[in-house]
Structure formats: C-alpha cells, structure tokens
C-alpha cells in the first residue's frame, strides 16, 4: 500500500495540523509562499513518488489565493510523481453559483472550479457539506461529500435544551433540518419562509410551526453576513421562542457579520473549523467552534485504505 502523506496550504493550518495529529503523522514538507509579484510559489521538499497524497486546503477568503495555492500544489505534487492526489477541501468556495437561474447571463462557477481541479491532476475530492450536493456531478473524478451534522448533533444532545424544536432558516434547508430533528430525539420542526430581494439581504416573512416557549435550534450549512440568521432569530423571539441557538458547518462571517451577531438576540452560534475565524469573531462570547478534525481524519484513513465513507454516517 502506498505511503499516505498529508500536505496543507495556508488556508486552514490549524485544522490541517489537528487532522495530522489525529492520524499520528506529520504534515508534509512543502514551502507554500509568494513570489515578489504575488504569484503563488510552491516547492515540495520531500519524496512523494508513488505516495497517496492528501492536500488539506479550504477555498475560503481570500478565495482566489487559496484556490490557486491548491491547484499549484496539486501540479507540483503531480510533477513529483505522486501516486494519487486527493484534494481535501473542508469548505468548497465558488459553490453558490451552481446553475443558471431563468437563463440569466451568469457563469456556473462551481463547474468552472471543478473542471480546474480535475484538469491539474486531482484524482479525488473530499469535502464537507457542499452548498449544493449536485456539485459532485460537476467533477470528472470521485467526490466524497461528508457531513458536519453528526458533530453538531452531538453538541446539541449535550445541551440542556428545553422542549426543543429544529428550525430551517429557509425552504431549501428543510431536508437538513428534518434529518437533524429526527436524530434529536425525533423533535418537532419549523420552517422560516423568507424572500431575498438581493444578494446577502433577506427578509423574514413567515414562520411555519409553533415555537412559543421552546428552545429553537436553527440549522444551516453556512453563515455568511449573518443577516438571515439574526432576522430569523428575531422573528422566532417575537413568536415567543425561549432561546435561539444557531448551528452551521461553515463560518464565513463576511461583511457586517460581527456587528450583526453581536447585536442579535441569538443566544449562541455554534460552527465548525472549516474556515479560520477572525480575531473579532473569536472575541464574541456568543460564538463557539467545534472541530471536524476527527471526522476528516477518519475519512482520509478510509479513503487511503479503500474503505467505505458512507458507512461513517449509517445510523
């Protein structure tokens, strides 16, 4: 069996190190930096010939820089005769444009990035909670999309929730919320129906379900500016919710996210470590982080050993 080696770019060094620790190994020796004009510079400083290589790199902000680091690392390792290269992308950026809406003159950037990664020599992709699961079909290589929900659910079960109800922040998240509700002792579910007049601006319209006097658990795949989340929490409190907890896998926290969350009625925001948090976000008492390192390490081990990934999520 080829030697398994882990490498990492500069996007999520802490998570990459945690994964390496879980696998009782060290991160590979590669210098990932910049030339004087800002271009990405990569040099692999150890033998990888025939190796089973995993590159851990989220394509979060700065998105273009982190994406280029990933593809240049892939090319460097491919030219160094790596046996198999798996791109471990905990947060897959450029995933929001996955279709053309009403024949608008817009790109399908998720497909562009998928083609880009395939063309430079990625043999397989491991990612977490893709914004749209159909993105897996954009790749010409195998994609394993694992879920952060078991980690989030474990935390929910440890909380002393009083008469909980799981809330989907929009219609698109109903499947996710229903799955969480079933595993959270088969609790009830509510849905927030909202309209989005323009990008990153949402308006809460209607709550489907009775939340009065209950602990509400909002679940989503990502938190961007936090505008949707905060308005949802406000609407839930207005309808009599006792406490509001928000759970999401990907903590993007862009724009006015810090102020939005700081001034919101949300009791706690729980996220995973797929994206590094800014110092301002870390300073918020409302925000708490869970690590996906154990789950990612197990997925990497299974891929390397040609074992089932889906078996990780069978209940």
UniProtKB/Swiss-Prot annotation:
Record-listed D-ribose 5-phosphate binding positions: 196, 220, 224-228
Alphabetical list of CDD domains matching this protein: PRTases_typeI
Record: residues binding Mg(2+) 2: 170
Residues annotated to bind ATP: 37-39, 96-97
Binding site for Mg(2+) 1: 131
Protein function: Involved in the biosynthesis of the central metabolite phospho-alpha-D-ribosyl-1-pyrophosphate (PRPP) via the transfer of pyrophosphoryl group from ATP to 1-hydroxyl of ribose-5-phosphate (Rib-5-P).
Domain of life, per lineage: Bacteria
Pfam assignment, any one: Pribosyl_synth
Organism: Photorhabdus laumondii subsp. laumondii (strain DSM 15139 / CIP 105565 / TT01)
GO CC, alphabetical: cytoplasm; ribose phosphate diphosphokinase complex
Keywords assigned: ATP-binding, Cytoplasm, Kinase, Magnesium, Metal-binding, Nucleotide biosynthesis, Nucleotide-binding, Transferase
Cellular compartment(s): Cytoplasm
UniProt cross-references to InterPro entries, sorted A to Z: PRib_PP_synth_CS, Pribosyltran_N, PRibTrfase_dom, PRTase-like, Rib-P_diPkinase, Rib-P_diPkinase_bac
Cofactor: Mg(2+)
Protein name as annotated: Ribose-phosphate pyrophosphokinase
Active site: 194
EC number, UniProt record: 2.7.6.1
Catalytic function, reaction form: D-ribose 5-phosphate + ATP = 5-phospho-alpha-D-ribose 1-diphosphate + AMP + H(+)
Cofactor note text: Binds 2 Mg(2+) ions per subunit.
Chief location bin: cytoplasm
GO terms for biological process, alphabetical: 5-phosphoribose 1-diphosphate biosynthetic process; purine nucleotide biosynthetic process; ribonucleoside monophosphate biosynthetic process
Pathway: Metabolic intermediate biosynthesis; 5-phospho-alpha-D-ribose 1-diphosphate biosynthesis; 5-phospho-alpha-D-ribose 1-diphosphate from D-ribose 5-phosphate (route I): step 1/1
Species classification: Bacteria, Pseudomonadati, Pseudomonadota, Gammaproteobacteria, Enterobacterales
Family that this chain belongs to: Belongs to the ribose-phosphate pyrophosphokinase family. Class I subfamily.
